[in-house]
């Protein structure tokens, strides 16, 4: 009788465990395989999904600044910049930097990990200016009591940007190299011992759909997914410590197609879909599987070979420059918003 009861109790326990497993959301399962990062400056969304890390960019900062609830942050940033003695155009630029950091500080109150903050994209081809701006952003964070380990400075993956990040990493300033579209960029980042890279998935897919006139690719042939898998496998095969964070997703299928990647930065809209999805999620990438994959060998890289390979890769070349231009435009929009808010042009003319 006792053994019969024990058997029934065990059956009930196993049934309950299976039921719980069946109702686990895709997002919850993904978090067990990959570090999930919020690709957003939306504080409400970050608080809702509770990712470990968060990423921002000029477009996201500008969108957040346009919200009414950001008014106080903007006013505080402007006041601080003015008290520091900045005037005219320099006042606007300093306000943008302070505001960007202030958003980062607010985000860090909601997460346990790191926030990525981007350097002015107009500096993407200027190594020294990028270094100087990154140091300024780092110093601003320190002024708010934020440890360096909780910040990643985002820099575009140009040759000049990667060399700037190499210097910053040596100084103890961790970097996130963004707008990355090819293995040649990933190799340069590895050589520079960068903390983290952000290869873009969705933008690669968009480019190929337009270039090849294809409406959709099956996930196993998705050019963006395959690009990240190649980079991930190369890093694991070579024992490279730089973390790979897939970015710029167009669908949850792309996200789940890279389950197991070191990190994935995901927009709130897709996080919401994953939270409602109960499909089974399995690792698509792993260090062990990378060792079994086709071996990837790369020759030693120089500035000349990097630039030559970039120019030969039309997709990477166009998307890198297009991404830089887009981020510059977003920063210009934020500059205009601030000028209109504070009547800066009228003040300058006076």
Describe every region a protein language model picked out.
Residues 17-39:
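N- or domain-start disorder-to-order transition segments that initiate the globular core
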Residues 57, 117, 153, 189, ...:
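Conserved, mostly hydrophobic/aromatic
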């Amino acid at each position: 009788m006792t053994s019969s009861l024990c058997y029934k109790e065990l059956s009930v326990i196993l049934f309950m465990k299976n039921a719980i497993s069946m109702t686990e959301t895709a997002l919850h399962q993904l978090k067990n395989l990959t570090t999930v990062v919020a690709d957003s400056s939306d504080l409400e969304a970050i608080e809702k999904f509770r990712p470990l890390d968060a990423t921002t960019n000029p477009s996201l900062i500008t969108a957040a600044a346009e919200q009414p609830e950001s008014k106080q942050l903007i006013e505080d940033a402007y006041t601080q910049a003015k008290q520091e003695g900045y005037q005219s155009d320099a006042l606007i630029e300093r306000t943008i930097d302070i505001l960007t950091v202030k958003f980062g500080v607010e985000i860090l109150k909601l997460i346990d990990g790191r926030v990525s903050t981007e350097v002015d994209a107009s500096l993407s081809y200027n190594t020294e200016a990028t270094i100087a701006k990154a140091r300024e952003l780092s110093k601003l964070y320190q002024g708010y009591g934020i440890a360096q380990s909780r910040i990643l400075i985002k820099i575009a993956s140009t040759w000049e940007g990667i060399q700037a990040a190499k210097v910053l990493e040596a100084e103890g300033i961790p970097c996130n190299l963004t707008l990355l579209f090819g293995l040649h960029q990933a190799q340069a980042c590895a050589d520079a011992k960068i903390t983290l890279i952000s290869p873009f998935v969705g933008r690669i897919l968009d480019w190929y759909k337009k270039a090849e006139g294809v409406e959709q690719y099956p996930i196993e042939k998705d050019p963006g997914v395959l690009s990240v898998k190649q980079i991930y496998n190369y890093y694991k095969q070579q024992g490279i410590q730089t973390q790979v964070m897939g970015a710029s997703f167009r669908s949850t299928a792309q996200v789940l197609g890279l389950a197991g990647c070191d990190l994935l930065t995901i927009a709130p809209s897709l996080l919401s879909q994953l939270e409602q999805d109960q499909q089974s999620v399995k690792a698509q990438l792993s260090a062990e599987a990378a060792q079994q994959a086709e071996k990837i060998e790369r020759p030693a890289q120089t500035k000349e070979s990097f630039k030559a390979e970039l120019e030969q890769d039309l997709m990477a070349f166009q998307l890198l420059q297009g991404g830089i231009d887009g981020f510059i435009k977003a920063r210009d929009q934020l500059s205009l918003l601030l000028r209109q808010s504070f009547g800066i042009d009228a003040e300058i003319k006076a």
